[in-house]
């Protein structure tokens, strides 16, 4: 959430972002949060979470129109469908689109590619993620990159967070060519232009795949421990799951072995998407 401001800084439709990082955990915080909400004199509030605390805080803040998911129904909540339905009701529209237009300055986009040969096919390697059970693994990524480098012209953006430098180091130390750029030492605002000018995303379910998908870029997302609903909203998401698994059954706690997704299979998918 703290990075959201950087992610949408260039969007002309967003006037202001107010980040509330306190008073959202305990029941007693309802009263403190309501005072903050009341200060802004909101006419409407839309809450994309079935939170009793937020609902009561909004009521105490005398906000006239409160839109929220059905309370006490968190289990089985489909993130995309629930958000879509709530937005349609709030805006009084039908069939709210789930694809969006991602805004970024043209100068930032141009700067991100000025040192990359225009003949190269640029691939984001999304090696980082929210937790170890969702990761395909550094070894698999380095093997994939090396295999691709034997048959094509590529440039790779190694996408890992600042706390995932060890993963990045492990990938880079096993590469046979120097056609890559590390992104772990860059801020989110610095990273985004590289993602938006790439040709393909390959990696774990992470923020990078959402940025690329919403930039109209094909995104191959490896699902090992994430619900399919996380990637249901975009036509640019293409899920990779182990053979024999039902995608609807994969969710938090599945703990599927990353080695069940073979490098050769991912390589074949990349070559196919490269042609198309």
Predicted regions and their residues:
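Catalytic machinery of carbohydrate-active enzymes
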Residues: 1-276
